[in-house]
């Protein structure tokens, strides 16, 4: 939790510092994302039962790398020019 709080604080501080220059700063903490690293951790018994994780996620699935990419693409677009200092969780609604 300390690292999470540090990233949140850094995001907000940088947004305040760079906002006057027209630079937005946001964070995108991911939920469980289906990557080779996640599957390897599952195979090695580091994650427990992935199906329980899916069941505890409101959208009932593991995220895809494309989910993270879509959020980042939005946040760097002109449409998100008024969004700064935010923690934009891409986690299927599962907040930990």
Roles of regions detected by a PLM:
Residues 32-56:
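A glycine/serine/threonine-rich, flexible loop-to-helix segment
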Residues 24-30, 34, 76, 89-91:
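Conserved SDR Rossmann-fold cofactor-binding beta-strand/turn motif
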Residues 73, 84-96:
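Short C-terminal tail/terminal secondary-structure segment
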Residues 3, 11:
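Active-site helix of classical SDR
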Residues 20-23, 86:
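Active-site loop of short-chain dehydrogenase/reductase
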Residues 16-20, 81:
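Alpha-helical segment proximal to the catalytic Tyr-Lys
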Residues 4, 69:
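Conserved catalytic core of two-component sensor histidine kinases
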Residues 57-68, 79:
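A conserved structural motif in NAD(P)-dependent oxidoreductases
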